[in-house]
């Protein structure tokens, strides 16, 4: 019996109320709108269900991959022979026990978390309002924008380490740096939830700041096209988009993938891009930038096999 047939039986017995689907097109669940089918996709509703599911999937060799909003990942056109664990049902955000604290589950969107904080009169997450990812992915990569990043406001993170169990780490233990954390080096680890320590503020002033940042984002970024956001990390001392623009690469196209003419830091799907188009275009950008400037660009987008 294959791993997925065994998992079919197990989920029916132990997680009968959890949504569980077969041969799911991944393009539906990624911001690039690219990707073949996942052999199986599960939608746990709680940390307990997720821990139980991932533990069993590992035992069966299902190579579970935990997917949030799918904003920083690219799946191959032939799909993946593994279990994709979709956290969309784990989207709760609430006040914490400590003053000025909120708790967000891994599947909550960064935007919804920022709006929750704003309505509660808590400041510190304004920068996150326009970031399209989920809390789990955002914490893992220390997401940020416009001078803010999650490391500035995180109090603790509860993580499933398959070989150690569930642990709660404080901000110092997370070893945050630019678009990096301890979890970047531990891809098997899964963020379950995070606690954020914010500052009191006036809801209307917080809302105004959020709207200003969103207006800047809409004016400068190609939000009308599918993409994974910033394609490359910022090299030390440089801006990736400026280097790409400097090299004359705006509009460069491979198949259905293109360097945005609005923002050179974005590779966009013009409507028919394949995974191979995007990866080939990224490689060509890296090659030309390296040749012309000497700077090596590091991808921010993860290609999942």
Regions found by a protein language model. Name each.
Residues 2, 31, 46, 55, ...:
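Generic serine detector
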Residues 11, 17, 33-41, 46, ...:
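Residue-level detector of solvent-exposed, low-hydrophobicity positions
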Residues 16, 100, 153, 295-297:
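Residue-level signal for beta-strand positions within conserved beta-sheet cores that form or flank
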Residues 21-22, 28, 73, 160-288, ...:
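Phosphate/pyrophosphate- and phosphate-bearing ligand-binding catalytic cores of soluble enzymes
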Residues 74, 79-94, 98-217, 243-245, ...:
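C-terminal structural segment of proteins
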């Amino acid at each position: 019996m294959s791993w997925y047939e065994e998992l079919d039986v197990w989920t029916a017995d132990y997680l009968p109320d959890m949504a569980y689907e077969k041969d799911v097109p991944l393009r539906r669940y990624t911001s690039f709108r690219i990707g073949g089918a996942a052999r199986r996709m599960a939608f746990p509703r709680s940390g307990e269900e997720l821990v139980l599911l991932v533990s069993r999937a590992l035992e069966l060799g299902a190579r579970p991959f935990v997917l949030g909003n799918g904003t920083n990942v690219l799946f191959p056109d032939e799909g993946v022979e593994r279990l994709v664990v979709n956290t969309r049902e784990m989207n709760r955000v609430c006040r914490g026990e400590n003053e000025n604290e909120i708790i967000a589950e891994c599947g909550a969107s960064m935007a919804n978390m920022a709006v929750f904080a704003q309505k509660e009169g808590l400041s510190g997450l304004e920068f996150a309002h326009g970031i399209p990812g989920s809390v789990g992915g955002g914490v893992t990569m220390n997401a940020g924008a416009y001078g803010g990043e999650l490391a500035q406001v995180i109090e603790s993170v509860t993580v499933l380490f398959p070989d150690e169990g569930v642990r709660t780490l404080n901000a110092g233990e997370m070893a945050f740096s630019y678009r990096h954390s301890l979890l970047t080096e531990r891809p098997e680890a899964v963020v379950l939830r995070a606690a954020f320590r914010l500052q009191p503020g006036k809801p209307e002033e917080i809302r105004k700041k959020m709207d200003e940042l969103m207006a800047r984002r809409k004016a400068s970024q190609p939000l009308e096209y599918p993409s994974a956001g910033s394609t490359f990390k910022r090299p030390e001392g440089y801006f990736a988009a400026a280097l790409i623009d400097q090299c004359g690469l705006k509009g460069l196209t491979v198949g259905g993938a293109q360097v945005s003419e609005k923002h050179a830091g974005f590779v966009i799907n013009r409507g028919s891009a394949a995974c191979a188009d995007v990866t080939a275009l990224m490689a060509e950008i890296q090659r030309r930038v390296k040749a012309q400037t000497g700077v090596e660009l590091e991808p921010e987008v993860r290609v999942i096999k």
